[in-house]
C-alpha cells in the first residue's frame, strides 16, 4: 500500500483543481464521490468518472474504482482513483496522511479532524482548529486561496464572484423540479433568452406561467449572452432552485470550458501549501 495517500472528498470542478495539483506534485490521490454527482462544469470535473468510468482533465486521467482493492492498484500505478463513498467510510480503512473536504456544500457533511493526521476543508461551513486543521478561502478576491488555521472562511453570500462585471446573472438555477435535457452543449455560444435546456416535470400537467413548453417541458433560457461554460448532465433529476448552468460573458474565452479555472488553481495552491507546511510530503 502506498504511503502519504491524500483523500479528497468531492470531484467537482473546484476540487478537481486540487486533485490535479496534488497528483502532479507526486501525491497518491483517492477521490470519494456520491453516486450521482451534479457538476456543472463537467468538462473539468473528475466526478464525471462516476458516469464514464474514466475522465481526463488537462492530460490527467481519473479512474473509477469499484472497490478499495482496485483503488490501491490504481494508486500503485500512479493514477488518480475515484470511489463512490458519500459518507467517507473508506477514510477510516485507508488511514490517509491527509484529508481534503472539497465538496463545497457550504456546510460540513461529516468531515472531522480525526479522519487524518491533517485535514483541510475548502470554503465556508468549517471552523479551522475545531472541524478541520485548516480551511482554504474560496471567495474570489484578495483572500482567495489563503490558508486559515483559526476560524472560518468568508460566509457564503449566495452571489457568484463577478466575471467581466457579471455576477449573479451568469449562474442559472432550475425554476422547477424535473429531469433536465440540454438543447445546447458546453462551449456553445448562446444569446440572452435563448433556450439552452428543457426540464421535464415528474408530474405531467403542471403549469408554470410564462414558461415555454416542449412536450410538457419547461424551457431554461440563457440569462446573459456568452459561452455556455457549464451545464448539468442530460437526464439529471433537479429540484427547484438547483444550480444547472453557468455562462461566461467573455466571448473570447472558449478554451476556459476545457481547462481548470484560475480560482480552482489558486485554491489548489493553498491546499498544497497547507499539506507541505504540515510536513506531509509527496512520495
Predicted regions span which residues?
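Well-ordered secondary-structure scaffolds
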Residues: 1-283
